[in-house]
């Protein structure tokens, strides 16, 4: 680690603590040359996989698109923002845990439905009707029947 004061490369760690719910490490360092102290924060760089669309095109994972889809599904439903954020975090964690560089958009849609079915059944049906492109009322009935099992 370079000293921000004198650019020396010889620094030592004086103190280390976990911060941000254990997702970061705060370190107090001291420069061996000028003896100035400074703080650094370290965190894991978690890279989301790229999304392979149904047409074969690839694009970066877009958390806002995921959030927007969930917000549309739960609109005017008794689901809190905390519940939504927890569901989104679970989806992102599952995607990272695959260890893959690319995931199919279908997998993301299925993960979204898995979370919605636990949050709110109506929101699940709303999302499924768009995601699965329901053509008529019987498809809604089939989806509702599966929920009631």
Swiss-Prot record:
Coiled coil residues, start to end: none
Zinc finger (unnamed): 3-34
HAMAP family named among the record's database cross-references: NrdR
One Pfam match: Zn_ribbon_NrdR
Full protein name: Transcriptional repressor NrdR
Record keywords: ATP-binding, DNA-binding, Metal-binding, Nucleotide-binding, Repressor, Transcription, Transcription regulation, Zinc, Zinc-finger
UniProt domain ATP-cone: residue ranges: 49-139
Sequence similarity: Belongs to the NrdR family.
Cofactor: Zn(2+)
NCBIfam families with a match to the protein in the record: transcriptional regulator NrdR (TIGR00244)
InterPro entries: ATP-cone_dom (IPR005144), NrdR-like_N (IPR055173), RNR_NrdR-like (IPR003796)
The keyword Zinc-finger belongs to this UniProt entry's keyword annotation: yes
Gene Ontology annotations of biological process type: negative regulation of DNA-templated transcription
Record function comment: Negatively regulates transcription of bacterial ribonucleotide reductase nrd genes and operons by binding to NrdR-boxes.
Cofactor binding description: Binds 1 zinc ion.
Gene Ontology MF terms in the entry: ATP binding; DNA binding; zinc ion binding
Keyword Repressor belongs to the record: yes
């Amino acid at each position: 680690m370079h000293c921000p004061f004198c650019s020396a490369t010889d620094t030592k760690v004086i103190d280390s603590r976990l911060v941000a719910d254990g997702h970061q490490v705060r370190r107090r360092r001291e420069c061996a040359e000028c003896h100035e102290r400074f703080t650094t924060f370290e965190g894991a760089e978690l890279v989301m996989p790229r999304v392979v669309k149904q047409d074969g095109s690839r694009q970066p994972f877009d958390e806002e698109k995921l959030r927007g889809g969930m917000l549309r599904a739960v609109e005017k439903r008794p689901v809190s923002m905390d519940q939504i954020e927890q569901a989104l975090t679970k989806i992102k964690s599952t995607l990272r845990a695959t260890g893959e560089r690319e995931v199919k958009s279908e997998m993301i849609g299925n993960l979204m439905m898995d979370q919605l079915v636990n949050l709110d059944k109506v929101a699940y049906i709303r999302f499924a009707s768009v995601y699965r492109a329901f053509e008529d009322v019987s498809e809604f009935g089939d989806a509702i029947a599966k929920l009631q099992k």
